[in-house]
Amino acid sequence: MRDSIWLDALTPKQARLCSSIYKEFKSKGLKVFVTAREYAETLQILELEGVPYRPVGKYGGASKAEKLIAYATRAQALLDEVNTRSICALISLSSPSAVRVAFGLGIPAITLNDTPHAFHVGRLTLPLSKKVISPIAVPKKELIRLGAEEQAILQYDGVDEVAWMRSYEPNPEVLRDLELKAGEPFVVMRPPEEKAAYLSNSFGQDILDLMRFIVSKEVKVVFFPRYPEQRSLAEMINGVIVPKKALDTISLYSYSVMIITGGGTMAREGSMLGIPSISLFPLDYPLYVNDYLKEKGFPIFRFKSYKEALPLISEILKDPKEYKVNTKGLLNELENPLDPIKSSLEEVGCLN
């Protein structure tokens, strides 16, 4: 009898969601098995959350050949990990290697996807998925365009981040970890994912100028690099703090005056805490979940470049309280993705 639920995490966001799913199902006495890729803070978040995992594979890099090699290598390693286990379903956020292995072994894949702009990842996962779970903000036609079967799509009125943000309580210890004083103004920053398949050109070369501008206003910057070369450049700027280890980033956002990120997750998390959050995304493509949160009243903003965002950044630095929002009521109105995940597991016979 297949009775184990397999979770696979590729990114820090996915580690957060996997942690929420793991805790939910383990509390009900279910068997849960977690695999995770070595990338950014993915493994460290699982460790901070107390989630046992098997590290499998690494990030592929910038070139198509490197990505393909990493995909194939990780698929083989995942096969070795799961082939002898009694797995009833895979849950992932569009993990190409994991979904391919699950499909080959006849394991139903339940795939979450809120990034239809990530074309390659979507095409590699959605056609092979038994269930596709997505926020209602993402048009069904976008998922179908990527190969999802219409009857497989299950949408919910919320965003993925609700799973771990709704009950989150900030811990001021994170300030001590970075030698920041209570009430000391700082901005949290993270650069874009320059090596992502959906970004064909380098983006965000003026990030150093922006950090220098912020610290010139006597506001510190806590910078989370994606790659080693970004770390070394940021550490040369006085007033910029580059964490040396994984920490409670969500608590950190709670005490910041603003978040500036080249990704979507950090901006959504920050805005759900009521902190003004700027997402920088260079493509002419809608960010459906960000737009959804903005329409709901969360303080999330989107620009194509740092220079385009500079006027708003300057205004927020002048008066951060003016842009902060009490979001507790707004957050409680959003649906938790754990609900459609549970119903999907029941549908594939995993919770019967």
Model-flagged regions — what are they?
Residues E49-A62, M211-P243:
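Catalytic donor nucleotide-activated moiety binding site of glycosyltransferases and closely related
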Residues K26-A70:
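Conserved nucleotide-sugar phosphate-binding/catalytic loop shared by glycosyltransferases and other
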Residues I110-T111, G122-S134, Y253:
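A conserved, positively charged/aromatic
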Residues L90-V101, T111, L252-V289:
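A donor-sugar binding/catalytic signature common to diverse glycosyltransferases
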Residues P320-N352:
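C-terminal amphipathic helix plus adjacent low-complexity
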Residues I133-S202:
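A nucleotide-sugar donor-handling region in carbohydrate enzymes
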Residues M272-L317:
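Catalytic binding pocket for nucleotide-activated donors in carbohydrate/polymer assembly enzymes
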Residues R74-E81, P228-M266:
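Donor nucleotide-activated moiety binding/catalytic core segment of transferases
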